[in-house]
């Protein structure tokens, strides 16, 4: 059952993404599978511009930004033990996990 598993992690907090990636890599390595990563993917920055005043002063604006951080982990030569370990793994609620087999 040797197959490639690709895990993408996405979050607004880079510390959560790094901790989750570290946890996944450590868990997979204990099962004996080969891991590449975590590979940092480009950071996406979304910028919001709003008026400071609700009525006048178009020149007075404020900008807010939301950064999303992504990491990629590839797992090779995985076994059923690896998949079971990944299913039981508890990750923080602020991390979005996408798994492709």
Swiss-Prot record:
InterPro entries reported for this sequence: Ribosomal_uS10, Ribosomal_uS10_CS, Ribosomal_uS10_dom, Ribosomal_uS10_dom_sf
State whether keyword Signal applies. no
Instruction: Tell me the domain of life.
Output: Bacteria
Q: Which cysteines are joined by disulfide bonds?
A: none
Q: Tell me the keywords, alphabetical order.
A: Ribonucleoprotein, Ribosomal protein
Single annotated GO MF: structural constituent of ribosome
Query: What's any GO biological process attached to this entry?
Result: translation
What GO cellular component term, any one, is given?
ribonucleoprotein complex
The question of whether Transferase is a record keyword is answered with: no
Xref: SUPFAM superfamilies: Ribosomal protein S10
Q: Tell me the first and last residues of the signal peptide.
A: none
What Pfam families does this protein's entry cite? Ribosomal_S10
Explain the purpose of this protein: Involved in the binding of tRNA to the ribosomes.
NCBIfam families to which the protein is assigned, alphabetical: PRK00596.1, rpsJ_bact
- Assigned protein family: Belongs to the universal ribosomal protein uS10 family.
Summarize subunit and interaction data from the UniProt record for this chain: Part of the 30S ribosomal subunit.
Q: What is this protein called?
A: Small ribosomal subunit protein uS10
Q: What is the organism of origin for this protein? A: Flavobacterium johnsoniae (strain ATCC 17061 / DSM 2064 / JCM 8514 / BCRC 14874 / CCUG 350202 / NBRC 14942 / NCIMB 11054 / UW101) (Cytophaga johnsonae)
Gene name of the record: rpsJ
């Amino acid at each position: 059952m040797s197959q490639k598993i690709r895990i993408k992690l996405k979050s607004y907090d880079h510390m959560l993404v790094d901790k989750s990636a570290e946890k996944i890599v450590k868990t997979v390595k204990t099962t004996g599978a080969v891991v590449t990563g975590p590979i940092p993917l480009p950071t996406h920055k979304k910028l919001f511009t709003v008026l400071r005043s609700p009525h006048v002063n178009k020149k007075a604006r404020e900008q807010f930004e939301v950064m999303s951080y992504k990491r990629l982990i590839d797992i090779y030569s995985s076994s059923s033990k690896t998949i079971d370990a990944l299913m039981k793994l508890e990750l923080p609620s602020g991390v979005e996990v996408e798994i492709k087999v």
